[in-house]
Each structure stands twice: as structure tokens, then as C-alpha cells.
């Protein structure tokens, strides 16, 4: 569904686009950053509520989410032929560490929240690095690789399509590495909330 979503639905309210529905609660900052990373990996329009992003905030939750949001917005204008105009393709397998994230789940027997609702804290495991692939009009394949955490991460991307040549770019489209004969797997080092675009031709 997420791949069809990229092609046919340009934007919806943030709570719905991340599967939260009307019973939205923020949960951990790490979970919000993971959702933002997935928004980028799926080629969706990044959206946040105004109170969630600020250039200056004393709230640690807001500072963390703001850092992720601003980092994840950078690739859109520089790789528009993939992220905005490309056709979604199956992403490669990514080997990386996992992280524990938490959110609130409605539960009448749970803890009473500030707004009066009752909920219990639920922990889920998710990858620290996510990826999505898009084919441009010229036939090249762009794979966006996203660090969903505030810590540096390493990941191994297993290429399903190797092509004749490949290049790895930073979010500002400066080149990091190039291969004349792409290997079957590529190791990527990502800074906090870092983004890379791997282009295979």
C-alpha cells in the first residue's frame, strides 16, 4: 500500500499518513523520527504539526524531531526526479541495527494521560536505517537511505539491480563514492539523521 500511496495520494493529514487515525498521541521522539524517516523513504510529502518543529526550543522532544525533519527535507529539491517524479520500485534489503520505540495505545485500564484518555505504553522494535527506491524517467534507479536515529549508524545495502555504474551522494548531492562496476552490496556510514542517495544506471 505504501508504494501505491506514493503514486496516487500526494498528501494527507499527518496522523493518517502514519497510521495513527483520530486517536493520535505523540509517543517517543524516536518514534516520531522513525515515522519521518519512513515518509522520506516512501517519497511522501513531509508534514508535521507546527508545535512539533522549531528552530529554537527548550523542549528536548521538539529539538530532536526538528533536527530530523529539517535533515529529511534536504533531499527533495536535489533528487526530485526520483523522490517527487519517480516511479516507486521495490527497495533493496538493508542490514542494520534495530531500536526499541514506544507509543501509547488506548486502554481503559491504562495510565491516565494529560488529556484524560487512558492508555498503556507499548514498545516496538524497528530498524535504525530505512530505504526506498524510485525509477527516474531516464531509467536510472535512485535509492534513498535514511538514518532514523540521532546516533551515527552503519548499514549494508544489498543491491537487487547492479547496473553498469553506481554513485553514492550526500543529501546536498555532493558525491561520496562511485563504482564503475557496482558490487552486490554496499556499506554506508550515516551521521545522525543522515541521508544518502544511491543512484544506479
Residue ranges and their predicted role:
Residues 167-184:
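Solvent-exposed beta-strand/loop surfaces of large extracellular or lumenal domains
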Residues 151-153, 175-177, 196:
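Short, surface-exposed beta-strand/loop "edge" segments at domain boundaries and coil↔beta transitions
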Residues 181-201:
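C-terminal beta-strand-rich structural cap/linker in extracellular carbohydrate-active enzymes
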Residues 161-165, 186-189:
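Short, low-complexity, polar/charged sequence segments that are solvent-exposed and flexible
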